């Protein structure tokens, strides 16, 4: 008879209030879950439903490091997690933002570090590091610093480090988010190898299009988990209502616009070359033009240089050679602040552009810095557009990933620039967040805004004006 890997009974958990005049934030009520050893389980839920919190609880990170009130039974490998955090050789965790768990000076050191803390012999460490690098296609990057990797490469590195440690249980918070098709295939193969060897896999996700229907599923909604069922047994309308993203059809709402090739250029590149200091060349003599009003997708695998390219459009990076022109002006002769009047930028990781104390202050900052007119009206409209009025005085840092993304979109709405650059805007979004983003893009496009979307999704050819 299989042993129980994870057992949760009548669990209730609330985070402490972020302000003295507020009530605790109740996340779970009467939660029940049972997973046997060597089983793979998928927890589906919308952004903010508590998927990440569930991983924190099972790893012993919450409430130990987060604070909060926990009642009920929570056992991992038959040990009470409330009494003792599970040791890393038993439980490994992949955070939703993999970059937060990378901290060493190189890719190979990142993989080796966890093995060293477990007391693995040096010769065995070398073998496991090389095997992990090969398994997750990181051999050519072994000496590179983790911060220099793309978002998808960082995700693969974090998974490679966990894979090398061979834990009995893996808690994987949206493990496929932000990965291109090759990266997803590598991750699936690595996880399947661990599962075949006897590991227990608990995955969370906010969408269904990347998962095998045979995997047992629990739906997390209204602070509780559903009964365990096969994914195909969950009606799509129920999933959509719960905020889960189903196989996307929303991109079909974008009909191709009339040809705008003869329109004046929004972005023009001439022999653009770029090389990071002490690093390899990334861009090699690029030439292309994006006319005003076009919807353009820049497509490529993780690490291909997509983010590096678009950061030239708003002056965050400057060419090593060649030129970039924005609205017919040489970008190298304009400051980042000046370019911000013409180009708004959505980072791949929303928390990188959130820094104010409240959501309202975050949306206000850009228009006020640029002395734009009607700042209060801009902020009010942006809050209303993304249903953020009730969160206007909350700190952005305490919001879920999907809501942080909505805040960043609200800031771009308030700026109302003629060019929008969005770096992997769909990564990590649940069904509601994806639908909200697509509606917003449709509105921007109808208003004549130039849209430049960086993506690893290869299925947009029929929906965009052009793919690069």
Language-model-detected regions and their locations in the chain:
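Helix N-cap at the start of a conserved alpha-helix in ABC-type nucleotide-binding domains
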Residues: 181-183, 431-433
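The feature captures the beta-strand-to-loop junction immediately N-terminal to the Walker
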Residues: 44-46, 299-301
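Helix-to-loop junction immediately C-terminal to a conserved catalytic motif
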Residues: 59, 314
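Conserved ABC transporter NBD signature motif
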Residues: 67-82, 322-330, 339
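Conserved ABC ATPase signature
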Residues: 145-149, 153, 395-399, 403
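Catalytic Walker B motif of ABC-type/P-loop ATPase nucleotide-binding domains
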Residues: 170-174, 420-424
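ABC ATPase C-loop
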Residues: 162-163, 413
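Conserved ABC ATPase "signature" region
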Residues: 123-141, 373-391
